[in-house]
């Protein structure tokens, strides 16, 4: 019997604080400096944002007699993109089981190696930033801040993909022929998309959730 386990935590922190200035050159050709930009054609834009995801995770693999292996993982994320919603954190697990048949059962000589496997997993991710609260946008044409085109949504949830997989790995004739066959299916939930808003709302579109989207099979 064997056991391997891992426990950890991480913080992914990304920030941007930038100002952009563009326009025609003033006097000196090919001298690209803000002091050489024509003030009559110059346009300024600013960008400032801060994303952070805090995570804890764990995994464990249990093996028996070098034949049967069980793998379990789990991860929980707290994402700043989900601020102002009721779903500030999200958990996604996985479990997998594999069996080395060639180590357990006497097979015909033509079969050098045989393993069967199965797994089920969830994968989650946050929506884009600033979709859950009012966020003014900068108009470089008028140098003013304006209402956003999209109406924010405080009911957003993390995008979630659930999938399961069955597979076979086999080798034949002294490893001269290899076979790797997989059958899987996955469904994606809570995808973010935009729909046209009523003109009287003052917005161009609304931010909504698509509940599920089945994927093709292999």
Regions inferred by a protein language model and the residue ranges of each:
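Extracellular/periplasmic, surface-exposed regions of secreted and cell-surface proteins
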Residues: 1-213, 217
